[in-house]
Amino acid sequence: MLYWLIDFASTIPAFNVFRYITFRTGGAMVTGALFVFLCGPWIIDNLRLRQGKGQPIRSDGPQSHLSKKGTPTMGGLMVLSGLVVGTVLWANPLNPYVWIVLAVTLGFGFVGFYDDYLKVTKQSSQNGFAGRWRLLIEAVIAAAACYALVRLGRDPLSSSLVIPFFKDVAINLGWFFVGFGAFIVVGAGNAVNLTDGLDGLAIVPVMIAAASFGLISYLAGNAVFADYLQINYVAGTGELSVLCGALLGAGLGFLWFNAPPASIFMGDTGSLALGGMLGSIAVAVKHEIVLAVIGGLFVLEAVSVIVQVASFKLTGKRVFKMAPIHHHFEQKGWTEPQIVIRFWIIAVMLALAGLSTLKLR
Protein backbone atom coordinates (compact mmCIF):
# COMPACT_ATOMS: atom_id res chain seq x y z
CA MET A 1 0.00 0.00 0.00
CA LEU A 2 2.85 2.39 0.76
CA TYR A 3 3.93 1.97 -2.86
CA TRP A 4 1.06 4.24 -3.87
CA LEU A 5 2.68 7.15 -2.05
CA ILE A 6 4.69 7.52 -5.25
CA ASP A 7 1.64 9.29 -6.68
CA PHE A 8 2.30 12.16 -4.28
CA ALA A 9 6.02 12.42 -5.08
CA SER A 10 5.50 15.53 -7.22
CA THR A 11 4.15 17.30 -4.12
CA ILE A 12 6.34 15.61 -1.51
CA PRO A 13 9.69 14.66 -3.17
CA ALA A 14 10.63 12.46 -0.19
CA PHE A 15 8.05 9.93 -1.37
CA ASN A 16 10.29 9.13 -4.34
CA VAL A 17 12.09 6.62 -2.10
CA PHE A 18 9.11 4.31 -2.51
CA ARG A 19 10.10 3.83 -6.15
CA TYR A 20 13.16 1.88 -5.09
CA ILE A 21 12.84 -1.85 -4.55
CA THR A 22 15.85 -1.83 -2.22
CA PHE A 23 14.19 0.69 0.12
CA ARG A 24 10.91 -1.21 0.16
CA THR A 25 12.70 -4.51 0.72
CA GLY A 26 14.37 -3.06 3.79
CA GLY A 27 11.04 -1.68 4.97
CA ALA A 28 9.36 -5.07 4.52
CA MET A 29 12.14 -6.75 6.47
CA VAL A 30 11.85 -4.36 9.41
CA THR A 31 8.04 -4.59 9.35
CA GLY A 32 8.05 -8.40 9.31
CA ALA A 33 10.53 -8.56 12.18
CA LEU A 34 8.70 -6.00 14.34
CA PHE A 35 5.35 -7.69 13.77
CA VAL A 36 6.62 -11.08 14.93
CA PHE A 37 8.58 -9.61 17.85
CA LEU A 38 5.52 -7.73 19.11
CA CYS A 39 2.80 -10.27 18.35
CA GLY A 40 4.84 -13.43 18.93
CA PRO A 41 4.24 -13.78 22.69
CA TRP A 42 0.48 -13.34 22.23
CA ILE A 43 0.38 -15.90 19.41
CA ILE A 44 2.44 -18.40 21.43
CA ASP A 45 0.24 -18.03 24.51
CA ASN A 46 -2.91 -18.58 22.45
CA LEU A 47 -1.50 -21.61 20.65
CA ARG A 48 -0.35 -23.13 23.95
CA LEU A 49 -3.79 -22.55 25.45
CA ARG A 50 -5.63 -24.09 22.49
CA GLN A 51 -3.28 -27.01 21.87
CA GLY A 52 -2.89 -28.22 25.44
CA LYS A 53 -0.25 -30.93 25.07
CA GLY A 54 1.36 -29.20 22.10
CA GLN A 55 3.14 -30.99 19.28
CA PRO A 56 3.24 -34.77 19.72
CA ILE A 57 6.77 -36.15 20.16
CA ARG A 58 7.72 -39.42 18.45
CA SER A 59 8.35 -42.15 21.01
CA ASP A 60 10.80 -43.89 18.63
CA GLY A 61 12.82 -40.71 18.07
CA PRO A 62 15.88 -39.42 19.95
CA GLN A 63 15.26 -39.53 23.71
CA SER A 64 16.47 -35.93 24.07
CA HIS A 65 13.32 -34.80 22.26
CA LEU A 66 11.07 -36.00 25.08
CA SER A 67 12.02 -32.88 27.04
CA LYS A 68 10.28 -30.81 24.34
CA LYS A 69 6.90 -32.29 25.16
CA GLY A 70 4.25 -29.62 25.59
CA THR A 71 5.83 -27.12 23.20
CA PRO A 72 3.16 -25.64 20.91
CA THR A 73 3.41 -25.99 17.14
CA MET A 74 1.92 -24.03 14.19
CA GLY A 75 4.52 -21.31 14.74
CA GLY A 76 4.47 -20.86 10.98
CA LEU A 77 1.43 -18.67 11.61
CA MET A 78 3.80 -16.11 13.14
CA VAL A 79 6.11 -16.14 10.14
CA LEU A 80 3.30 -16.06 7.59
CA SER A 81 1.56 -13.20 9.40
CA GLY A 82 4.74 -11.12 9.43
CA LEU A 83 5.39 -12.03 5.80
CA VAL A 84 1.91 -11.00 4.67
CA VAL A 85 1.91 -7.74 6.63
CA GLY A 86 5.36 -6.78 5.33
CA THR A 87 4.43 -7.68 1.76
CA VAL A 88 1.06 -5.94 1.70
CA LEU A 89 2.55 -2.76 3.15
CA TRP A 90 5.65 -2.50 0.98
CA ALA A 91 5.21 -4.47 -2.28
CA ASN A 92 3.73 -3.11 -5.49
CA PRO A 93 0.11 -4.35 -5.29
CA LEU A 94 -0.20 -4.30 -9.08
CA ASN A 95 2.64 -6.79 -9.62
CA PRO A 96 1.20 -10.24 -10.51
CA TYR A 97 4.35 -12.12 -9.47
CA VAL A 98 3.80 -10.97 -5.89
CA TRP A 99 0.30 -12.41 -5.75
CA ILE A 100 1.19 -15.68 -7.48
CA VAL A 101 4.00 -16.41 -5.02
CA LEU A 102 1.91 -15.27 -2.08
CA ALA A 103 -0.94 -17.56 -3.20
CA VAL A 104 1.40 -20.57 -3.29
CA THR A 105 2.81 -19.66 0.12
CA LEU A 106 -0.58 -19.34 1.78
CA GLY A 107 -1.98 -22.37 -0.06
CA PHE A 108 0.85 -24.59 1.16
CA GLY A 109 0.53 -22.98 4.57
CA PHE A 110 -3.13 -23.99 4.75
CA VAL A 111 -2.25 -27.60 3.86
CA GLY A 112 0.43 -27.60 6.55
CA PHE A 113 -1.96 -26.03 9.07
CA TYR A 114 -4.51 -28.79 8.51
CA ASP A 115 -1.79 -31.41 8.90
CA ASP A 116 -0.64 -29.82 12.17
CA TYR A 117 -4.23 -29.58 13.38
CA LEU A 118 -4.83 -33.31 12.84
CA LYS A 119 -1.58 -34.26 14.58
CA VAL A 120 -2.30 -32.07 17.60
CA THR A 121 -5.92 -33.15 18.01
CA LYS A 122 -5.03 -36.83 17.63
CA GLN A 123 -1.77 -36.41 19.58
CA SER A 124 0.11 -38.51 17.05
CA SER A 125 2.83 -37.43 14.64
CA GLN A 126 1.78 -40.30 12.36
CA ASN A 127 -1.89 -39.34 12.01
CA GLY A 128 -1.74 -36.12 10.05
CA PHE A 129 -3.12 -35.30 6.62
CA ALA A 130 -2.96 -38.43 4.40
CA GLY A 131 0.22 -38.18 2.34
CA ARG A 132 -1.30 -38.83 -1.09
CA TRP A 133 -4.04 -36.24 -0.60
CA ARG A 134 -1.60 -33.71 0.78
CA LEU A 135 0.71 -34.14 -2.21
CA LEU A 136 -2.23 -33.96 -4.61
CA ILE A 137 -3.44 -30.63 -3.21
CA GLU A 138 0.11 -29.25 -3.20
CA ALA A 139 0.56 -30.35 -6.82
CA VAL A 140 -2.68 -28.66 -7.89
CA ILE A 141 -1.69 -25.39 -6.19
CA ALA A 142 1.82 -25.52 -7.66
CA ALA A 143 0.63 -26.43 -11.17
CA ALA A 144 -1.90 -23.57 -11.16
CA ALA A 145 0.84 -21.15 -10.12
CA CYS A 146 3.27 -22.42 -12.78
CA TYR A 147 0.54 -22.19 -15.43
CA ALA A 148 -0.05 -18.58 -14.38
CA LEU A 149 3.69 -17.85 -14.59
CA VAL A 150 3.92 -19.30 -18.10
CA ARG A 151 0.87 -17.32 -19.24
CA LEU A 152 2.29 -14.20 -17.63
CA GLY A 153 5.59 -14.47 -19.49
CA ARG A 154 4.08 -15.14 -22.92
CA ASP A 155 7.47 -15.93 -24.45
CA PRO A 156 9.63 -19.07 -24.91
CA LEU A 157 11.66 -18.21 -21.81
CA SER A 158 8.64 -18.57 -19.52
CA SER A 159 8.36 -22.28 -20.37
CA SER A 160 12.09 -23.00 -20.56
CA LEU A 161 14.55 -24.62 -18.19
CA VAL A 162 17.61 -22.39 -17.98
CA ILE A 163 20.97 -24.14 -17.56
CA PRO A 164 23.43 -22.25 -15.33
CA PHE A 165 27.12 -21.79 -16.23
CA PHE A 166 26.27 -21.46 -19.94
CA LYS A 167 25.32 -18.36 -21.92
CA ASP A 168 21.86 -18.43 -23.47
CA VAL A 169 21.34 -22.17 -22.94
CA ALA A 170 17.71 -23.00 -22.21
CA ILE A 171 15.56 -26.04 -22.95
CA ASN A 172 12.04 -25.12 -24.00
CA LEU A 173 9.74 -27.62 -22.32
CA GLY A 174 6.55 -26.08 -23.66
CA TRP A 175 3.54 -26.89 -21.51
CA PHE A 176 5.51 -29.72 -19.88
CA PHE A 177 7.16 -26.92 -17.93
CA VAL A 178 4.00 -26.61 -15.84
CA GLY A 179 4.54 -30.15 -14.54
CA PHE A 180 8.26 -29.58 -14.08
CA GLY A 181 7.69 -26.33 -12.23
CA ALA A 182 5.08 -27.96 -10.01
CA PHE A 183 7.59 -30.70 -9.16
CA ILE A 184 10.13 -28.05 -8.11
CA VAL A 185 7.62 -26.20 -5.92
CA VAL A 186 6.21 -29.33 -4.26
CA GLY A 187 9.70 -30.77 -3.83
CA ALA A 188 10.97 -27.58 -2.21
CA GLY A 189 8.02 -27.43 0.17
CA ASN A 190 8.44 -31.00 1.37
CA ALA A 191 12.24 -30.80 1.53
CA VAL A 192 12.04 -27.85 3.93
CA ASN A 193 9.35 -29.74 5.84
CA LEU A 194 11.72 -32.68 6.36
CA THR A 195 14.49 -30.34 7.52
CA ASP A 196 12.34 -28.86 10.28
CA GLY A 197 13.22 -31.32 13.03
CA LEU A 198 15.46 -29.42 15.46
CA ASP A 199 15.21 -26.03 17.15
CA GLY A 200 16.29 -23.38 14.64
CA LEU A 201 17.43 -25.92 12.05
CA ALA A 202 15.04 -25.01 9.23
CA ILE A 203 14.37 -21.30 9.70
CA VAL A 204 17.97 -20.08 9.32
CA PRO A 205 18.68 -21.98 6.06
CA VAL A 206 15.30 -20.73 4.81
CA MET A 207 16.37 -17.15 5.58
CA ILE A 208 19.72 -17.72 3.89
CA ALA A 209 17.95 -19.03 0.78
CA ALA A 210 15.45 -16.15 0.92
CA ALA A 211 18.26 -13.59 1.08
CA SER A 212 19.96 -15.29 -1.88
CA PHE A 213 16.81 -15.35 -3.98
CA GLY A 214 15.99 -11.82 -2.95
CA LEU A 215 19.26 -10.80 -4.60
CA ILE A 216 18.66 -13.02 -7.62
CA SER A 217 15.13 -11.62 -8.05
CA TYR A 218 16.44 -8.06 -7.91
CA LEU A 219 19.13 -8.78 -10.51
CA ALA A 220 16.87 -10.82 -12.83
CA GLY A 221 14.23 -8.09 -12.69
CA ASN A 222 16.69 -5.34 -13.61
CA ALA A 223 17.53 -5.17 -17.33
CA VAL A 224 20.91 -3.50 -16.75
CA PHE A 225 22.16 -5.96 -14.14
CA ALA A 226 20.74 -8.96 -16.01
CA ASP A 227 22.57 -7.90 -19.17
CA TYR A 228 25.82 -7.33 -17.28
CA LEU A 229 25.67 -10.74 -15.59
CA GLN A 230 24.31 -12.38 -18.75
CA ILE A 231 21.39 -13.92 -16.92
CA ASN A 232 17.85 -13.97 -18.24
CA TYR A 233 15.89 -10.77 -17.69
CA VAL A 234 12.40 -11.45 -16.35
CA ALA A 235 10.50 -8.17 -16.18
CA GLY A 236 8.63 -7.61 -12.94
CA THR A 237 10.35 -10.24 -10.83
CA GLY A 238 12.44 -7.65 -9.01
CA GLU A 239 9.40 -7.04 -6.82
CA LEU A 240 9.84 -10.53 -5.36
CA SER A 241 12.80 -9.11 -3.43
CA VAL A 242 10.26 -7.36 -1.22
CA LEU A 243 8.67 -10.72 -0.33
CA CYS A 244 12.09 -12.15 0.44
CA GLY A 245 12.81 -9.16 2.67
CA ALA A 246 9.53 -9.66 4.52
CA LEU A 247 10.34 -13.35 4.99
CA LEU A 248 13.83 -12.54 6.23
CA GLY A 249 12.45 -10.15 8.84
CA ALA A 250 9.64 -12.46 9.93
CA GLY A 251 12.15 -15.32 10.10
CA LEU A 252 14.44 -13.33 12.39
CA GLY A 253 11.50 -12.60 14.66
CA PHE A 254 10.52 -16.27 14.72
CA LEU A 255 14.10 -17.37 15.46
CA TRP A 256 13.97 -15.28 18.62
CA PHE A 257 11.30 -17.65 19.94
CA ASN A 258 12.51 -20.81 18.17
CA ALA A 259 16.10 -20.64 19.44
CA PRO A 260 16.98 -23.54 21.77
CA PRO A 261 15.12 -24.33 23.91
CA ALA A 262 12.28 -23.45 21.55
CA SER A 263 9.16 -21.75 22.88
CA ILE A 264 7.34 -22.78 19.71
CA PHE A 265 7.83 -25.04 16.70
CA MET A 266 7.29 -23.89 13.13
CA GLY A 267 5.27 -26.97 12.23
CA ASP A 268 4.14 -27.98 8.77
CA THR A 269 2.23 -24.69 8.68
CA GLY A 270 5.49 -22.84 8.25
CA SER A 271 7.87 -25.34 6.67
CA LEU A 272 5.58 -26.30 3.78
CA ALA A 273 4.65 -22.67 3.12
CA LEU A 274 8.20 -21.32 3.16
CA GLY A 275 9.54 -24.16 1.03
CA GLY A 276 6.75 -23.62 -1.47
CA MET A 277 7.55 -19.92 -1.53
CA LEU A 278 11.22 -20.54 -2.30
CA GLY A 279 10.30 -23.00 -5.03
CA SER A 280 7.82 -20.66 -6.71
CA ILE A 281 10.30 -17.76 -6.63
CA ALA A 282 12.97 -19.96 -8.22
CA VAL A 283 10.54 -20.89 -11.00
CA ALA A 284 9.50 -17.27 -11.52
CA VAL A 285 13.07 -15.97 -11.90
CA LYS A 286 14.19 -18.98 -13.99
CA HIS A 287 16.74 -20.29 -11.49
CA GLU A 288 15.26 -23.68 -10.73
CA ILE A 289 18.57 -25.55 -10.90
CA VAL A 290 20.30 -22.91 -8.77
CA LEU A 291 17.67 -23.58 -6.09
CA ALA A 292 19.02 -27.12 -5.80
CA VAL A 293 22.44 -25.63 -5.00
CA ILE A 294 21.38 -22.81 -2.67
CA GLY A 295 18.88 -25.12 -1.00
CA GLY A 296 21.26 -28.06 -1.09
CA LEU A 297 20.78 -28.69 2.61
CA PHE A 298 17.07 -29.27 2.02
CA VAL A 299 17.91 -31.57 -0.90
CA LEU A 300 20.27 -33.54 1.34
CA GLU A 301 17.57 -34.01 3.97
CA ALA A 302 15.01 -35.15 1.38
CA VAL A 303 17.44 -37.50 -0.37
CA SER A 304 18.41 -39.09 2.96
CA VAL A 305 14.76 -40.04 3.53
CA ILE A 306 14.36 -41.39 -0.01
CA VAL A 307 17.54 -43.46 0.27
CA GLN A 308 16.55 -44.77 3.71
CA VAL A 309 13.09 -45.87 2.58
CA ALA A 310 14.32 -47.36 -0.72
CA SER A 311 17.16 -49.25 0.97
CA PHE A 312 14.90 -50.72 3.64
CA LYS A 313 12.27 -51.83 1.13
CA LEU A 314 14.80 -53.36 -1.27
CA THR A 315 17.33 -54.89 1.14
CA GLY A 316 15.72 -54.75 4.57
CA LYS A 317 18.69 -52.67 5.78
CA ARG A 318 18.92 -49.00 6.73
CA VAL A 319 21.67 -46.74 5.40
CA PHE A 320 21.31 -44.24 8.24
CA LYS A 321 20.68 -44.79 11.93
CA MET A 322 17.60 -42.61 11.47
CA ALA A 323 16.24 -40.32 8.78
CA PRO A 324 16.13 -37.44 7.96
CA ILE A 325 19.89 -37.17 8.23
CA HIS A 326 19.95 -34.68 11.11
CA HIS A 327 18.50 -37.45 13.31
CA HIS A 328 21.28 -39.76 12.10
CA PHE A 329 23.85 -37.40 13.59
CA GLU A 330 21.82 -37.18 16.80
CA GLN A 331 21.99 -40.96 17.11
CA LYS A 332 25.76 -40.78 16.53
CA GLY A 333 26.11 -38.57 19.59
CA TRP A 334 26.20 -35.06 18.13
CA THR A 335 24.44 -32.55 20.35
CA GLU A 336 21.52 -30.59 18.93
CA PRO A 337 23.42 -27.25 18.88
CA GLN A 338 26.32 -28.93 17.06
CA ILE A 339 24.05 -30.27 14.33
CA VAL A 340 22.10 -27.03 13.94
CA ILE A 341 25.11 -24.70 13.74
CA ARG A 342 27.07 -27.02 11.43
CA PHE A 343 24.07 -27.29 9.12
CA TRP A 344 23.80 -23.48 9.14
CA ILE A 345 27.43 -23.30 8.04
CA ILE A 346 26.71 -25.74 5.22
CA ALA A 347 23.71 -23.62 4.17
CA VAL A 348 25.87 -20.49 3.98
CA MET A 349 28.51 -22.25 1.89
CA LEU A 350 25.90 -23.65 -0.50
CA ALA A 351 24.29 -20.22 -0.85
CA LEU A 352 27.64 -18.70 -1.82
CA ALA A 353 28.18 -21.52 -4.31
CA GLY A 354 24.74 -20.93 -5.82
CA LEU A 355 25.24 -17.17 -6.08
CA SER A 356 28.58 -17.72 -7.81
CA THR A 357 26.70 -19.23 -10.76
CA LEU A 358 25.43 -15.73 -11.56
CA LYS A 359 28.91 -14.69 -12.63
CA LEU A 360 30.29 -17.97 -13.94
CA ARG A 361 29.18 -17.99 -17.56
UniProtKB/Swiss-Prot annotation:
CDD domains hit by this protein: GT_MraY
InterPro entries associated with the record: Glycosyl_transferase_4 (IPR000715), PNAcMuramoyl-5peptid_Trfase (IPR003524), PNAcMuramoyl-5peptid_Trfase_CS (IPR018480)
Keywords: Cell cycle, Cell division, Cell inner membrane, Cell membrane, Cell shape, Cell wall biogenesis/degradation, Magnesium, Membrane, Metal-binding, Peptidoglycan synthesis, Transferase, Transmembrane, Transmembrane helix
Topology in membrane: Multi-pass membrane protein
Coiled-coil intervals: none
GO MF annotation list: metal ion binding; phospho-N-acetylmuramoyl-pentapeptide-transferase activity; UDP-N-acetylmuramoyl-L-alanyl-D-glutamyl-meso-2,6-diaminopimelyl-D-alanyl-D-alanine:undecaprenyl-phosphate transferase activity
GO CC terms of this entry: plasma membrane
Domain of life the protein comes from: Bacteria
Protein family membership: Belongs to the glycosyltransferase 4 family. MraY subfamily.
Its job: Catalyzes the initial step of the lipid cycle reactions in the biosynthesis of the cell wall peptidoglycan: transfers peptidoglycan precursor phospho-MurNAc-pentapeptide from UDP-MurNAc-pentapeptide onto the lipid carrier undecaprenyl phosphate, yielding undecaprenyl-pyrophosphoryl-MurNAc-pentapeptide, known as lipid I.
Name of the protein this chain belongs to: Phospho-N-acetylmuramoyl-pentapeptide-transferase
Origin species: Rhodopseudomonas palustris (strain BisB18)
Gene that encodes the chain: mraY
